[in-house]
Amino acid sequence: EALFTPWKIGNVEIKNRIVMCPMGGTSLFGWFELTGCGFDKEAAKLFLERAQNNVGLIIPGIAPLRDTFWGKWLWQNPKMFEELKEFMDEIHKTGAKLFIQLTAGMGRSWAITELVGPLHKNKITRAIVKPIIDTSHELASPSEQPARWAPDIICPEMTKEQIHEIIEAFAKTAKLC
């Protein structure tokens, strides 16, 4: 019975205590796509189905502020947020709530693949692929330190400019969400 009682997070009332927790691969924004970030209609179908089956709160997987490929900021994709708005209208019709999890990025926790490691270690290849995937930006951390999953790769310290860009991106993206 307690599962079906409403509760609040701040001033947001959740209709019941059934929560779909975040899982890898469940972001609404396809942020690891070679074609660039976009609204993930397949993930949206999954969430809408859960909302229609009485889940009170849905928390999708992370939404990095910046595309892994091509380096475009989320807030620079108005079409994606138009699709998100339409989707949120459908979610709200069920009485459910959905919270978007914005993240600055991965930093030292970024999963280094067998392909990315050598690209990053070699200054020439790193420079060549930078327009497609800026490994130094993806690995940027609060201080210079080893990558979590590839300790032989040293993550660069974030610059003040990067910090200001991330703060601005949080504000602009949150406003659109």
Residue ranges and their predicted role:
Residues E1-E114, C155, I166, A174:
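N-terminal capping/small domains of soluble enzymes
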Residues H92, K97, T103-L176:
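Non-globular sequence segments
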